Amino acid sequence: MTSVSDVASSTGFDWARWRRRQGWSIGVWVLLAVLIAWYTQLIPRFGTFQVASIAKNSLPLSFLAVGQAVIVISGGIDLGLGAILVLTNSVAAQLMHEQSLGMALLIAVGIVLGAAVLNGSVGWVINRSRVPDIVVTLATSFIYSGLALLVLPGPGGGTPAGFRFLFTGSESGSGSNFLPAIVMLIIPVVAVALFMRRSRTGLSLYAIGSDPNAAYLSGVDTGRAKIIAYAVGGGLAAMAGLATVAITGTGDPRFSIGSNATLNSVAAVVLGGVALTGGVGSVIGAVAAAIIVFFLSPILSAMGIDPNSAQVVQGTLIALVMMLAGLLALRRRRAE
């Protein structure tokens, strides 16, 4: 059982404990490095253009996985994050069309804050109603998807070239400049990682995920923490939506985009070492896993596997690794 005081009062550096907590995350990053090295052998002219493509196109799922990780660590799960991606993508494309970069940035800030407040209210509903997270968020996913279609009935809209450059390193959305995408990923991920491990609220989320009753008895405001977890998840899902509109240059309200993104985010969270039972894992591992989940498709394509078969292989691999990750996470939790 993990409590806030247990985590916060630790004064020495326990290498054994660190290995138990971060060993899987490190392994996921090593696996990602191996896959990239393998991919360079499959592509004859692998270079900065391919690096930029991987960096920018994995941004949406990476943001979504980090948001999902925060919620799952707190003992919940959000099946509506993918729908928030679609909704914010549609709103951004509609509002940013033919606007200046400055106005687009103001709109982006408003969208992120609005999504955080909106999803934070979902956390409040879950806490007050005691209805399981999976039921409430499944319902909100349909609400968000319907709102997306009201905002943007079909693919369309647009975004300023300067806004696209911030995420893709190119005003056209393509090119070999991968630094902007990496910077856009690192800043929020590091901020969330520090929040989870260095702030009292972040440590409270681990305590709640480990044992909500014990956390409550130790003085943790579990309701407030639940709201914050869902607010952070909503804000990061909005970041995923903004990254999507920056990459594609248009909005797309299709329901399938959101549902696929949600399932992939859950897969990335588990693959990254976060236990679905809560209280275990890190957002750093979830990022590496998200890139791997995204990366499987181009790898299978480079191997010459047809798209239909590739989807079966990809799903099977993810399922197997998720089961292994779940078993190891459970074993690690029992060891602690």
Q: Predicted segment positions?
A:
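Transmembrane alpha-helical segments in multi-pass inner-membrane proteins
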Residues: 237, 252-315
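Alpha-helical transmembrane segments within multi-pass membrane transporters and channels
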Residues: 100-141, 288-292
